[in-house]
A protein has these predicted regions:
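Internal helix-loop-helix
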Residues: 1-58, 98-105
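Short glycine/proline-enriched turns and hinge-like loops at secondary-structure junctions
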Residues: 5-6, 73-75, 99-104, 118-121, ...
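Short Ser/Thr-interspersed hydrophobic loop/turn segments at strand-loop and sheet-helix junctions
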Residues: 14-18, 110, 127-132, 157-161
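A short, Trp-centered hydrophobic/proline-enriched beta-strand micro-motif
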Residues: 57-66
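Glycine-rich phosphate/pyrophosphate-binding beta-alpha loops
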Residues: 70, 95-101, 146, 187-190
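A structural signal for short hydrophobic beta-strand segments in well-ordered beta-sheet cores
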Residues: 79-82
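A short core secondary-structure module
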Residues: 91-137
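Glycine-rich beta->alpha junctions and the first turn(s) of the following alpha-helix
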Residues: 124, 136-228
């Protein structure tokens, strides 16, 4: 399925989208290079099928990683998933979650503890927002730009995750975080592409204005101060 574009071609399309509307470019990146990438890499057949069906229905999965005290240093997250029988109980808080309030499928990162309280590493857990008890969407958070795509707080209060909704890389929880992060390399490129598109759009608009606006009888684009 899909248009069959290469990764380079897809980013060229995103760049042009972002040149006109940054949020639109970012929505494409988040929907095609974010959580869905990790699910395709490490999800089971049933998990991949579930995610694909939701995306085809219009959903854009949300990635729940960032916390108030764990931004760039994401490995310092405190959200935890405690194993109880064949389930995991997730408690914690995430913020700046892109599309958190509108996405149905959430990929949640949390520290994993076995039934004896021993930490196992960091894992990924899938939850469907409107079916999950214990997943609560908080306030929409203000941003300087890209306001066309919402950023929200997400709270987990004894959220139950069944074993079949655990995203498990072959390395298990010990190296799971590193493996899952590697699955986001395409999203990192996409984020840079959106930034480049915004810069291109800004340059085009500035150039058009400088060629149209006149002072002292000629376009201001002809003045050395604007040509530097």
């Amino acid at each position: 399925g899909g248009p069959g574009h290469s990764f380079l071609e897809a980013n060229l399309v995103v760049e042009e989208m972002a040149a006109f509307c940054g949020p639109t470019g970012r929505i494409v990146v988040e929907g095609n290079m974010g959580a869905i990438s990790a699910i395709l890499h490490y999800g089971t057949e049933s998990q991949r099928r579930m995610a694909a069906e939701m995306v085809l229905a219009g959903d854009k999965p949300a990635i729940c990683i960032t916390e108030p005290d764990a931004g760039s240093a994401a490995s310092q997250m405190t959200t935890r998933a405690d194993k109880r029988g064949d389930k995991y109980i997730v408690n914690g808080k995430k913020h700046w979650i892109t599309g958190g309030g509108v996405s149905r499928l959430h990929l949640i990162f949390a520290r994993v503890f076995d039934e004896g309280g021993n930490e196992q590493g960091i894992g990924g857990f899938l939850a469907i927002r409107d079916e999950a008890k214990g997943l609560r969407i908080g306030a929409r958070e203000p941003t300087m730009g890209l306001r066309g795509i919402p950023e929200t707080e997400v709270f987990f209060e004894d959220l139950e995750i069944s074993a079949d909704m655990v995203l498990m890389p072959p390395s298990g929880f010990k190296r799971g975080f590193a493996d899952l992060m590697n699955a986001y390399n395409s999203q990192r490129v996409g984020a840079g592409t959106v930034a480049l598109g915004l810069a291109v759009g800004g340059y085009r608009n500035a150039l058009a204005f400088a060629q149209e606006r006149e002072q002292f009888g000629r376009p201001i684009a002809e003045f050395q101060g604007l040509q530097w």
